[in-house]
């Protein structure tokens, strides 16, 4: 399938702008390992221009053009963007699939979610107008008070490659709804659809500088964005190591951050489940998006009474997954995003075997695919809690397995992690599911499923999985500053100080 990759520049101040140093980066199709295009590579010089453009857009006309415009005004732009995404859905899905390797069906689903996210935050932007000047109940009748919610300012956004456009929009849509202006730095491994978002913003007439998009390396564009003194907040999705570095940079300026970082999430399967249904949700929880999901439920805890039957079916189902070029009909597992990621996944599985674990299937290149960064999904059993594959995030199609005998043991094993992003519990006993949901040390819990995500529900983790919440009303609050206004309404003087004697 011939797909034309548009040649774009950086998007700064509403204009396509060549990088100051004229650097570029190759775009590699992970299914073929071929270079299919180039993206501009921003550096600190371009970050300066983008921050200046965002700052001007925020303050233009005393903020009346954007930051202090009504939510209804901003909502019109968000809805126009959503309509354009649907209009260009096929093109955007093709670019997403060829850029990051996810199956085309998944990429198309992502585009629906992108449009839905813009629509959702358009509604919330309109609702924000009615929430201004919310009255406060004060204990003294000589005062009245109210609350103002104001955009936090210029926001820097650094986003990952597993959901290149969708996870960018999780940040862009609520920030624009709130009245912020933004600089988006997508991952250098998958930036094509984010550049097309810039083109859509240009088409709908989004005011110049409201959204600026810089592609490039994290060290050359992301780091100077995170440490820039005129960026009011940083939001980041990615590795815990990078998130820690961003926190360090922000701390020097007392700059707020929201971080959605790594995960090693558990899925607990009790012995009263429908095994076929549970097997499919277990697979979906770990192998969806080619296994490259921050919330992947990649630690399977299965009750010992059903473990043999469950694993037998799980291996058979997993071997039946269609692994192919993302554009082949019925593809359910494409390549991982890059050579580095491919080598990382293979090494994790190899190390597990060397540590004494049993590889039930996968963890190697499929025999029928001689090129591309393809990995057969791996299922690894006989793991111990000290093994690397149990404790560290693989970010690829690799599932490790342990058995348990009691509910308490399952919960203890589930929470035995430095991460706390998500967890899943599968059981027909809903009271037990409720107990386990409360016991999980995680920000997201799935009951009798794994991975469904809706823009109406909050998203984020605990422990080393980060802090702050995206999506839902919480996602909008992420970009708002709360101001309290208190007014003295009595006709009488305050009377605290004795007035000077009259002469």
Swiss-Prot record:
It comes from the Eukaryota. The keyword Metal-binding applies. The record marks 162 as: Transition state stabilizer. The active site is at residues 260, 294. Pfam families: Aldedh. Na(+) binds at residues 99, 189. GO terms for cellular component: cytosol; peroxisome. Keywords: Metal-binding, NAD, Oxidoreductase, Peroxisome, Sodium. Optimum pH is 9.75 with 4-aminobutanal as substrate. Optimum pH is 9.5 with 3-aminopropanal as substrate. Disruption phenotype: No visible phenotype under normal growth conditions. Mutant seedlings exhibit increased sensitivity to salt stress. Its EC number is 1.2.1.-, 1.2.1.47, 1.2.1.19, 1.2.1.8. GO terms for molecular function: 3-aminopropanal dehydrogenase (NAD+) activity; 4-trimethylammoniobutyraldehyde dehydrogenase activity; aldehyde dehydrogenase (NAD+) activity; aminobutyraldehyde dehydrogenase (NAD+) activity; betaine-aldehyde dehydrogenase (NAD+) activity; gamma-guanidinobutyraldehyde dehydrogenase (NAD+) activity; sodium ion binding. InterPro entries: Ald_DH/histidinol_DH, Ald_DH_C, Ald_DH_CS_CYS, Ald_DH_CS_GLU, Ald_DH_N, Aldehyde_DH_dom. It is an enzyme of class 1 (oxidoreductase). It is found in: Peroxisome. Homodimer. This is Aminoaldehyde dehydrogenase ALDH10A9, peroxisomal. The lineage of its organism: Eukaryota, Viridiplantae, Streptophyta, Embryophyta, Tracheophyta. The gene is ALDH10A9.
